[in-house]
Amino acid sequence: MSKKYEGPSMMEELWEYVKMIVFVVVIVFIINNVLLINARIPSESMEKTIMTGDRVFGNRLAYMTKDPERFDIVIFKFPDDESQLFIKRVIGLPGETVTIKDGKVYINDSEEPLDDSFVAETPVGDFGPYKVPEGSYFMLGDNRNH
């Protein structure tokens, strides 16, 4: 007499689903906390490049093998309030002197201002000179009047 195959028990099947769900949760956790950063744009400081309310993903590992370059858009925690994420553009590099005259950005007493084709509107005001400390970067939003 042949024995009839009954398949996995209900508990075995349930256990397989639980393992699959735990696996997916672990993968999502790793992606969200190690590989990617998911941020919502809270203000108009980066408009016209990134609009208020947009969601952006950043690569948490991007600067493990290289340093940020001028004009990179980076997501970072503000040193004085690490609970908030900021999204800005790298303008000044470590050791450089940044000066803003009539809304134009100058690096190290250059006669030529930096490219500002991505800036939403012509900013007003002056700033600096400011020497960027080693290990730090000078960041600005693209919508400089906000």
Cite the ranges covered by each PLM segment.
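Soluble "head" domains of membrane/secretory-pathway proteins
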Residues: 2-19, 30, 34-40, 47-146
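Residues within membrane-spanning alpha-helices of integral membrane proteins
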Residues: 23-26
